[in-house]
């Protein structure tokens, strides 16, 4: 049996084999080695000129990274209290595998600390919401843009933390994560086609099943801009869009459900024939959170 490094080298010499069945066998064997061989594949890519071989190497690197993403999401979902932000970072890593995540974590911590300094126990929930909105959208000048499936980066939490515009998903994730870290009762709820956070009253218990959670909601916040609005505004939204209000719309979404929703929306950005494989892969990834 060949030593590990020798076998990898031998497999590399066969990547350009014209027989697709041979390449499939070689590819699957290399995938068994996992992500540690990615630097070697990248080095091979840099020293390869043949177009088909380059595409094969790129595909293998992508599959190795996707395998890691699947494992990271499974590990995250299995945690007793999975962080919403850390779940969103997994999707950032899918799209930008070389991006360092610690600077994003540090930036969020700065925002959390500055928000905490402005809060006190005497503020009403609406005053708390105004503090968060001022910190995010005035002090840090986070910008909100309409949801567009032509701009996948807008869905990622990395965008608002890097002074780039974020859509309702990215900005709402930052807002919701802050509230969870600061123990503020603002939760993502299941309003159709919207990213809405509901501020629940202090006597509401998130893990208790109640017949009508709407009774505990004080007001709502729109994720793109942090703007608060009332139940009357919500009722008008349903009326305007011919949506029949249902109790399920007011139920809190778990962090796993939020991240699943994010992944499936992000997948819609990849509908072109050349990128459709990404949509299929993301839909499969989201199934981990079923």
Task: Show where each model-derived region lies.
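A structural boundary/capping signal
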Residues: 1-290
């Amino acid at each position: 049996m060949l030593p590990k490094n020798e076998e990898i080298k031998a497999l590399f010499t066969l990547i350009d084999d014209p027989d697709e069945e041979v390449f499939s066998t070689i590819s699957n064997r290399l995938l068994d080695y996992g992500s540690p061989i990615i630097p070697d594949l990248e080095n091979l890519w840099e020293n390869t000129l043949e177009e088909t071989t380059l595409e094969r190497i790129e595909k293998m690197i992508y599959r190795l990274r996707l395998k890691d993403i699947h494992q990271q999401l499974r590990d995250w979902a299995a945690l007793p209290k999975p962080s919403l932000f850390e779940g969103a970072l997994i999707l950032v890593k899918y799209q930008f595998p070389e991006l360092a995540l610690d600077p994003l974590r540090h930036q969020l911590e700065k925002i959390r600390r500055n928000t905490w300094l402005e809060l006190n126990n005497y503020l009403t929930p609406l005053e708390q919401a105004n503090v968060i909105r001022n910190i995010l959208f005035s002090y840090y000048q986070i910008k909100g843009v309409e949801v567009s499936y032509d701009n996948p980066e807008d869905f990622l939490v990395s965008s608002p933390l890097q002074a780039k515009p974020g859509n309702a998903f990215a900005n709402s994730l930052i807002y919701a994560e802050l509230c969870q870290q600061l123990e503020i009762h603002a939760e993502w709820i299941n309003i159709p086609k919207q990213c809405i956070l509901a501020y629940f009253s202090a006597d509401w218990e998130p893990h208790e099943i109640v017949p009508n959670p709407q009774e505990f909601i004080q007001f709502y916040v729109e994720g793109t801009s942090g703007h608060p609005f009332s139940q009357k505004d919500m009722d008008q939204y349903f009326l305007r869009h011919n949506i029949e209000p249902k109790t399920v719309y007011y139920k809190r979404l778990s962090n796993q459900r939020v991240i699943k929703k994010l992944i499936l929306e992000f997948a819609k950005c990849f509908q072109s024939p050349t990128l459709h494989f990404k949509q299929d892969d993301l839909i499969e990834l989201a199934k981990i959170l079923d």
